Amino acid sequence: MFRIGFIKFIFAFFCVFSSSAQIIEESELAVITREDWKANPPVMEIIPHKPQFITIHHTGMPQKPDLSIEKKLQALQQFSQKDSPMADGSIKKAWPDVPYHFYIATSGKIAEGRDINFQGDSNTDYDLNGHVLIVVEGDFNKEKLLPEQWESLKRLVSFISSEYDISRETISGHKDQAETTCPGSDLYSKLPLLKVEHPVKIGAERLFENEYFDLIRNKKIGVVTNHTGLLPNGEHIVDLLHQNPDTKLTMLFGPEHGIRGEEDTHVTDSKDEKTGLPVISLYGKTRKPTTEMLKEVDVLIFDIQDIGARYYTYIKTMLLVQEAAAENDIPFIVLDRPNAIGGIYVDGPVGKPGEPVTDIDMLPITHGMTVGELATMFNQEREKSGLPSADLQVIPMENYEREHWYDQTGLPWIKPSPNMLTLTTAAFYPATCLLEGTNLSEGRGTLQPFEFIAAPWIKPEELITQLQSYDLDGISYETTRITPQQMVDGIEIYPPKFMDEEIPAVEMSLTDRKNFKSVEAGIYILHALKKLYPEELEWRKPRLDGLLKTDKVRIALDAGKQPQEIIQTWQEDLKSFKKIRAQYLLY
């Protein structure tokens, strides 16, 4: 990261002169060359390398739109080529040249920095061999990336990837390589969009296209959403609807964890500070909108990112809102989003096998469907069963492939809830959420919830030996200790088990997520605990049976049944569900 403590001092030494930089075209990419900005030659030897990776930085200093890009590069070179003071009082040793290969200014103009065929430099400690360094002007922990900068960054990355045969999968932020916050939170959140050539376009983006906008034009709108209701550019669906002159946003509804995703217990009604609109909690006393709540609503919109497990509560909220829409003759629009853990893996006991899939209870633990597909299935299955069905419109995604996990969609990850910090957490969730039905900790209260098996009385080494004996695909284990806290990532959560107590734990890691079967892993984990700790292990029967939608698993474990025997018991029911599911897949 380009960090200097006395940037104003350095800029004061700019040579003010008239410059009409010639901009050249390179494969349709406009780049201001070193010659254009009157670069000095390197002052010492530079190390050649072969470009293999693309790494994004920010300058870490406030944007300076009034200064030309030529002057900025001259100042950067002056700073780089001599010993210079840093913000922390240390002295940066001289570099041969500007540290970055490309510089993107506030105007979106791109300038050539160091020759791309030579290694760059950094104030942080990482191996720069092969890294093409792109710096974007600004401090994106405090500032927003400008649209002009974003468009230029996309074009530049596309050019470099094509010209030097560099996979987009190699794109990373400086913070992925070293201990730093660079390139800042706003820019870093957008990097996934650079990794795929054709990112998924979510339903929220398509809502404003001509094909769909008439569904909401001049309508009074109620929105069910939370902090995940963001478009890839960082704009929130609520703000877009509130600001649009052709729509009238009248009511907001929030799910579990609230409309801002910062609450971990029952949520109360409130007012949205930004819009001044009332926010009705659908995870407190009220779980389904009432007729009174909907009297000023012409159309209901649902836009929330789910993770793909039945016991993640957002899809239950969606179904209840869908029921309310049907009962009150209000059109219901679902803005589709990816299934975070992919749309292929379907597994787990089916709550009411053989019956129409009209409720959440009829789903297996992992259903392999998007929220739009689920809404379609619930609606049509309800209609077949003589239950009220909604006037449903699913706005589908573009470029979505159901075998892709969330990090393959090109969409920025936004933690869907306080304890769902990463995609790895989401991958383990179908397995280790079952520990909520026991007296063990699943890791809530840590920065890796659902990635641990922990309790004061377990012996991690022997538990790992037992788990390894099952030879499960895609998972590894190691011993550790955890201390669950009530504050996680700045949010106060419901008090976790063993709060403030350091306890032994087994930490799990994904080694092959494509072949990892999370539901089966959950059964094997419960079996291992029952086998090794029959006296210490306690079932929380209502919770465990509620998660599994059956008491048969618990009873079988108590009877000493083997995991594969238990897993086999739901296979026929799963086949029946898959046949129903296949009718409603949109992708």
Residue ranges and their predicted role:
Residues 1-23:
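Bacterial Sec-dependent N-terminal signal peptides
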Residues 22-54, 59, 63, 106-199, ...:
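Basic/polar, cationic surfaces and motifs that engage anionic cell-wall
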Residues 52-58, 99-105, 109-113, 131-136, ...:
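Structural recognition of the beta-strand scaffold that forms the well-ordered cores
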Residues 265-297, 309:
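Glycine-rich oxoanion-binding loops at beta->alpha junctions
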Residues 355-429:
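Conserved anion/nucleotide-ligand pocket segment
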Residues 400-487:
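Glycine-rich, aromatic-lined ligand/substrate-binding cores of catalytic
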Residues 454-568:
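Conserved functional hotspot residues or short segments at active or partner-binding sites
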